[in-house]
């Protein structure tokens, strides 16, 4: 079976923004074009970040910030992970799963943005990759479960009590706030004592 490159399934009409655009302007672009992300580029059209709907909710709305005063540079995810258009789609899927992302900006040899590919784009042309994704996700989950916790702390909504926290930790396959984390630790200690 011939391998397909990301360049063959990529969208070429990428909606971009500048680092100085406001959150309102970015949100308007998403709504206007029916998309879930905007790639932030510099004056050379090189991708320097990406803003998703989730970024707007977590970094602006949930913190009560005025979206007219928040600029893209302050809320974009960076550095942005990019690929070249000759990368095979199965490699792109593995990269997405490994990094926990759903879209990859595509750049040319000079680092200039020329397209974007999403997990959905790939699965529409290569549905057989669903099995690959599931396999990679399982490996990823197993690796996470081997760790008692991931040292990275993020902000967001706790998967257990559903309250907003700036100190979420990934434990036992879920993002938890400090209070729920203490509860989990307490349960583990009790379980160990019962086993002894």
Swiss-Prot record:
UniProt domain ACP-type MB: residue ranges: 153-187
Keywords tagged on the record: CBS domain, Iron, Metal-binding, Repeat, Zinc
InterPro entries referenced in this protein's UniProt entry, alphabetically: ACP_MB (IPR044065), CBS_dom (IPR000644), CBS_dom_sf (IPR046342), Diverse_CBS-Domain (IPR051257)
GO molecular function, one term: metal ion binding
Matches recorded under Pfam families: CBS
Domain of life: Archaea
Binding of Zn(2+), residues: 158, 161, 177, 180
Protein name, as recorded: Uncharacterized protein MK0525
Organism: Methanopyrus kandleri (strain AV19 / DSM 6324 / JCM 9639 / NBRC 100938)
């Amino acid at each position: 079976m011939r391998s397909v490159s990301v360049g063959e399934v990529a969208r070429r009409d990428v909606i971009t923004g500048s680092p100085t655009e406001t959150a309102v302007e970015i949100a308007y672009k998403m709504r206007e074009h029916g998309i879930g992300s905007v790639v932030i580029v510099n004056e050379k059209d090189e991708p320097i970040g990406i803003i998703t709907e989730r970024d707007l909710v977590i970094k602006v709305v949930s913190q009560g910030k005025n979206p007219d005063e928040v600029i893209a540079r302050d809320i974009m995810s960076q550095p942005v992970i990019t690929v070249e258009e000759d990368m095979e789609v199965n490699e792109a899927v593995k990269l997405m799963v490994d990094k926990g992302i759903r879209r990859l900006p595509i750049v040319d040899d000079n680092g200039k943005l020329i397209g974007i590919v999403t997990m959905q784009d790939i699965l529409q042309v290569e549905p057989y990759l669903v099995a690959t994704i599931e396999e990679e996700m399982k490996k990823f989950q197993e690796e996470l479960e081997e760790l008692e916790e991931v040292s990275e702390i993020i902000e967001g909504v706790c998967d257990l009590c559903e309250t907003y926290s700036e100190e979420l930790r990934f434990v036992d396959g879920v993002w938890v706030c400090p209070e729920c984390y203490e509860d989990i630790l307490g349960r583990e200690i009790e379980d160990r004592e019962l086993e002894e």
